[in-house]
């Protein structure tokens, strides 16, 4: 906890002392909504415009000590992360996020200033994409729980599904891979070097705008890397009935960027690149040239549905599952 965070914890009234409605008023007062929000907080529900009559909706949750730690992250970091991971799901559909609805649970003795900092982080991240926080709920519970529902607009484009990949197309990524997993390992091992990697675990950096750009040029299928590259590509392979073959050479830049951190930890960087989640890069399949900012990392072949690396099965840990068992870390040849 930083000096500033300690100040928030010691000088602020608690959520219980203020009461639910006073806390909510503090969190929403003076916030400017984007033009797509026709009615924000203050009524029974919000009203958000849907430009082409369709709405893209996604929900995700963060639970303290499962998805974030308050001895690593500031409340503002948690707020930014909660919005970023939901916005990435909207991006992966080829849409843009326009509004977010937030649920927050915390112990009654939580300083109200910490809740305010959480919402500040949410507004900061939402502002990066021109979206707003339009409502939510506040409850008392034993630990912090943050639930975010994202609302998005396709702006007249067709949605990009997981099921559209076809043999003969190329696989491309925009964004960086393995950074969050490397940062997590550094945090767990108490290594204070590699500040940027440690930061990337706390606050991901989705490639905002690139989902819509991919949809505009006819991306066949797309997903954001939340659970790990291999795990998320398996969703596309199974939904589309195709085989995906990744190129290790095309991913070497990600490996090289993590080599120094891996050396400090005495480990191999490849599992971070292939299996590490929470980077929220976008991966998509294209028939023609890939859009600016994207890089080709593999190809799509006829089924059966599998994900390979240089034509071979990856035998190590393949990615996060909320109810899965821990696995070994694996290696690349």
Swiss-Prot record:
Organism: Mycobacterium tuberculosis (strain ATCC 25618 / H37Rv)
InterPro entries assigned: PurM-like_C_dom, PurM-like_C_sf, PurM-like_N, PurM-like_N_sf, ThiL-like
Taxonomy of the source species: Bacteria, Bacillati, Actinomycetota, Actinomycetes, Mycobacteriales
UniProt entry tagged with the keyword NAD: no
Residues annotated to bind ATP: 136-137, 162, 226
Alphabetized NCBIfam families for the sequence: PRK05731.1-4, thiL
Residues that coordinate or bind Mg(2+) 2: 60, 89
Protein name: Thiamine-monophosphate kinase
CDD domains hit by this protein: ThiL
């Amino acid at each position: 906890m930083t000096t500033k965070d300690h100040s928030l914890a010691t000088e602020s009234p608690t959520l219980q002392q203020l009461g639910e409605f006073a806390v909510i008023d503090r969190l929403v007062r003076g916030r400017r909504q984007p033009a797509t929000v026709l009615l924000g907080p203050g009524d029974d529900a919000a009203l958000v415009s849907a430009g082409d009559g369709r709405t893209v909706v996604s929900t995700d949750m963060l639970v303290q000590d499962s998805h974030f730690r308050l001895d690593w992250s500031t409340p503002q970091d948690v707020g930014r992360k909660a919005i970023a991971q939901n916005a990435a799901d909207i991006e992966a559909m080829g849409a843009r996020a326009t509004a977010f609805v937030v649920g927050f649970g915390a112990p009654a003795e939580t300083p109200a200033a910490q809740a305010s900092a959480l919402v500040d982080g949410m507004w900061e991240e939402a502002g990066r994409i021109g979206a707003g926080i339009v409502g939510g709920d506040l409850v008392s519970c034993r630990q912090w729980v943050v639930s975010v529902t994202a609302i998005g607009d396709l702006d007249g484009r067709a949605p990009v599904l997981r099921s559209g990949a076809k043999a003969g197309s190329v696989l491309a990524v925009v964004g960086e891979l393995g950074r969050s997993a490397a940062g997590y390992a550094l945090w767990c091992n108490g290594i204070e070097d590699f500040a940027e990697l440690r930061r990337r675990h706390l606050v991901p950096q989705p490639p905002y705008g690139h989902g819509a750009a991919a949809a505009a040029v006819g991306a066949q299928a797309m997903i954001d890397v939340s659970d790990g590259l291999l795990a998320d590509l398996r969703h596309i392979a199974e939904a589309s009935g195709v085989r995906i073959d990744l190129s290790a050479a095309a991913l070497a830049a990600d490996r090289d960027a993590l080599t120094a951190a891996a050396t400090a930890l005495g480990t191999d960087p490849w599992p971070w690149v292939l299996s590490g989640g929470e980077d929220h890069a976008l991966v998509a399949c294209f028939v023609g040239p890939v859009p600016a900012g994207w890089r080709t990392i593999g190809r799509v072949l006829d089924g059966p549905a599998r994900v390979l690396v240089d034509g071979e099965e990856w035998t190590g840990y393949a990615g996060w599952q909320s109810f899965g068992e821990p696995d070994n870390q694996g290696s690349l040849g």
